[in-house]
Every structure is written in structure tokens, then in C-alpha cells.
């Protein structure tokens, strides 16, 4: 697979990080390395740590960043483990971190990966091909109620009960093995009015199953909290999200970390000792310009939130 990928909100991310030429930065979702390449171009004696759970992405990034090889350390891991990653590298706090939480275009476009509802492929959806849980396992073996729950909670799919019931009916007779088989089942469970809508009928369900396979939302919360704890004072954290579930988690983590004293107003003095960890730099998330959306439609749903360690 050719891992060419158009980075979203590239200039906005670089501005947000306020890169120091001698600083240490971490890209927790390396992907096509577009953001990382631009970070490297702003470094002199500094260092970039690139993290991705997808070995294909890491190999592609290694080639793309070859001119900056002396500045770059690549790590095969999940960004939720950012604390352990830094510790293993002999680091505690660094100058900035970037997380682009969207699935990269090459992953979506590679039919074999099973992320797309537009091409036939085995039900896989693993970002890390070394993990055991796949979309096949979820679709064929998870209880109907659990399926309904993930479709509703992770995909915000209004027809979750009907889709879960349809999946259960089919898998009772035979295993559901491919993406287009699943698409047909989803279509069969939806009313004609829903099938006429602009959005593809399988979009929400595929998002939900992908999130469950990769534990994406759990990784977001854990990763963001760890990232804040491992920033130097003045260090920046920039996070791009692509759907409301992720954005809500990032927003809540930021707001919680920005809080100071939590003692009741009736207390004459603070006894909790809590102080803000960060200052939120984006009251509202930064979104793509009209020009970027026209050039890269994927950027339409992107939101960038930025915080600074205090």
C-alpha cells in the first residue's frame, strides 16, 4: 500500500505547537508523516518522536522522513501509552505533542484493511494488524445487545436495534465475512427513507465497529491525560478530532485539566490543593478554511483544540 496522505490543518497545527528549534516533540498518530515532516523542518538540534500502531504507516513514514533521520525516533505503539513511551526513551517532559485522531486515507483506501464500506474486503478494521480482535469477531460473536450498544454509542446510529437484530438473524445461518455483506445487512434493516439520505447508510455502523475494534475512545482519554502530564511548562498539546465523540472527550479532558480549586465556595481557604495543569488556547476549536475543504473534503469535519501546560 502506498501511504500517501494529505495532512489536515497542517499550518494551524505547526502554529499551535510554537516549535522551538531545539525542542523535543511527539507525533502520537504519525500516519503519513505530513505533520511530522513539517515539524522536522522547523527543528535544528531538536528531536521528533513519531508513534503509530500501524507498521505500514511507520515504514512509509521512515521513507518520507529519511532526510531528517538523525532527528527522528519511530515507535510502534499506541499513543495511549505515551507516558511509557517517553519513559522508555529516557524522557519525562517534552515541548509539544500532536495527535491527529482520524483514520488516515490510505487505511480507508486499502480494501484489504476492511475499513471502507465502498469496497469488498474481509471484516478486519484493525489499525494494529498484530492485535487479535477484528471486526469479524465483533460482528459474528458479540451478543446482540452489545452490538446494539456500540452502534448507538460509538456510531450514534438511530437504527441500531434494527441493525443488530438483522446481523443476528444472518449470522445464525452463516458467518458474515466481508464488508459488502455487512453493508447489505445494514441496508436491509433500514427504512427506505434512510436509504435515500445523502450519507451512506453504513457510515455510522462502520465507524462504530472500527472504534470498538481499536478501542479508540478509551485511547483518546488515556492518551490526552498522559500527554498533559508529560509536557514541560509552556509545552503545547494540539489535538485534531473528526467526530463529536472524540471531540467531546478532548474538550472534557482539557476543561478538567484547566480547573483549579474544587473546594466548595463556602470553604474560607483551599484545602484540595488543586491547581490548573493547562491553559486552553482555543475557546472554540479551529476548523479548516473553505479553501482547504475544497482541496481536501476530509478536512470538513476536522476540529483542532490546543492547550498549553502551566
Identify what each model region corresponds to.
Residues 1-310:
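S-adenosyl-L-methionine-dependent methyltransferase catalytic core, i.e., the SAM/SAH-binding region
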Amino acid at each position: 500500500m502506498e501511504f500517501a496522505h494529505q495532512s489536515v490543518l497542517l499550518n494551524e497545527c505547526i502554529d499551535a505547537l510554537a516549535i522551538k528549534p531545539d525542542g523535543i516533540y511527539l507525533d502520537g498518530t504519525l500516519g503519513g508523516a505530513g505533520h511530522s515532516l513539517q515539524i522536522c523542518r522547523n527543528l535544528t538540534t531538536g528531536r521528533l518522536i513519531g508513534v503509530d500502531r500501524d507498521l505500514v504507516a511507520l515504514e512509509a513514514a521512515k521513507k518520507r522522513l529519511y532526510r531528517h533521520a538523525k532527528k527522528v525516533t519511530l515507535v510502534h505503539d499506541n499513543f495511549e501509552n505515551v507516558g511509557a513511551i517517553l519513559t522508555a526513551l529516557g524522557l519525562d517532559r517534552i515541548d509539544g505533542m500532536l495527535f491527529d485522531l482520524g483514520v488516515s486515507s490510505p487505511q480507508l483506501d486499502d480494501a484489504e484493511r476492511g475499513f471502507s464500506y465502498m469496497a469488498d474486503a474481509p471484516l478486519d478494521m484493525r489499525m494494529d494488524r498484530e492485535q487479535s480482535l477484528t471486526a469479524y469477531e465483533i460482528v459474528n460473536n458479540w451478543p446482540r445487545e452489545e452490538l446494539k450498544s456500540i452502534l448507538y454509542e460509538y456510531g450514534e446510529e438511530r437504527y441500531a436495534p434494527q441493525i443488530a437484530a438483522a446481523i443476528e438473524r444472518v449470522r445464525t445461518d452463516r458467518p458474515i465475512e466481508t464488508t459488502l455483506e455487512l453493508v447489505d445487512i445494514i441496508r436491509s434493516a433500514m427504512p427506505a427513507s434512510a436509504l435515500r439520505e445523502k450519507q451512506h447508510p453504513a457510515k455510522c455502523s462502520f465507524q462504530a465497529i472500527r472504534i470498538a475494534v481499536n478501542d479508540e475512545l478509551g485511547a483518546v482519554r488515556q492518551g490526552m491525560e498522559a500527554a498533559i502530564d508529560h509536557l514541560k511548562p509552556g509545552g503545547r498539546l494540539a489535538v485534531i478530532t473528526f467526530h463529536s465523540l472524540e471531540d467531546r472527550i478532548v474538550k472534557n479532558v482539557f476543561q478538567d485539566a484547566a480547573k483549579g480549586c474544587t473546594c466548595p465556595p463556602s470553604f474560607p481557604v483551599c484545602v484540595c490543593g488543586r491547581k490548573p495543569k493547562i491553559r486552553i488556547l482555543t475557546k472554540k476549536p479551529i476548523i479548516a478554511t473553505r479553501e482547504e475543504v475544497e482541496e481536501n473534503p476530509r478536512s470538513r469535519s476536522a476540529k483542532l483544540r490546543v492547550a498549553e501546560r502551566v
